[in-house]
Amino acid sequence: MKILSFKDYNELSKEASKIVLNQVISKPNSVLGLATGSTPLGMYKNLIVAYQNKNIDFSKIKTFNLDEYYGLSKHNNQSYYHYMMENLFNHINIDINNINIPNGTASDILKECSDYEDKIKNYNGIDLQILGIGVNGHIGFNEPSTYFEPSTHVVTLDKKTIESNSRFFSSKEEVPTKAISMGIKTIMNAKKIILLANGKNKADAIFKTVNGKIDPNIPASILQLHNDVTLILDKDAASKL
């Protein structure tokens, strides 16, 4: 596990975008695993600028998002589909047919999960997976549990997650209580992983991810077993290491 600590969020975002750019330049048809939330926003802004400056071509890449709220229409402005379109896809030359985000309103949700998993396998897995981390140590929407859920699945969201995500909604009651998420095995099968974290509220989860025992109660701790994972942190998130 490689740990990079930066003085602030801007420097963290620059490093993350540099890794993504290098991946796409070295393999133009890369399969990228993408994350949402506030942490990757700076990285996405940098990628848009790189595209506008003609430093990068996204036309051949494929993307798979980690998760999506269950029961939320993709047209809802809090859906992760909406987030990705607004914060990245509408501003780069990606082929819309190469964008993959779980369908939270699929009529057969279990089939949606297995189809999503199969599609990732059909592309020979993810080349570079981008992760954030929850204050409870979740990655994707793999919440603290008694076991590691292997493949794409429906999950009931942890109270801490609902509370944390309520800042994006008018009230806590509006936050969906379930989501579709890539599983731990799916994430761990990525050839390379970068995890981004900023802020003191993430310091405890980062400490347990790096120094704790491998424990499904801290889902990110499983990353200790991956052979190419880099944690990209600001000094606050790294403050307990």
From Swiss-Prot:
Its EC number is 3.5.99.6. InterPro entries: Glc/Gal-6P_isomerase (IPR006148), Glucosamine6P_isomerase (IPR004547), Glucosamine6P_isomerase_CS (IPR018321), NagB/RpiA_transferase-like (IPR037171). Signal peptide: none annotated. The active site is at D67, N136, H138, E143. Pathway: Amino-sugar metabolism; N-acetylneuraminate degradation; D-fructose 6-phosphate from N-acetylneuraminate: step 5/5. GO terms for molecular function: glucosamine-6-phosphate deaminase activity; identical protein binding. It comes from the Bacteria. One of its GO terms (cellular component) is cytoplasm. Keywords: Carbohydrate metabolism, Hydrolase. It catalyses: alpha-D-glucosamine 6-phosphate + H2O = beta-D-fructose 6-phosphate + NH4(+). GO terms for biological process: carbohydrate metabolic process; glucosamine catabolic process; N-acetylglucosamine catabolic process; N-acetylneuraminate catabolic process. Pfam families: Glucosamine_iso. The keyword Ligase does not apply. Belongs to the glucosamine/galactosamine-6-phosphate isomerase family. NagB subfamily. Catalyzes the reversible isomerization-deamination of glucosamine 6-phosphate (GlcN6P) to form fructose 6-phosphate (Fru6P) and ammonium ion. This is Glucosamine-6-phosphate deaminase. It comes from Clostridium novyi (strain NT). The gene is nagB.
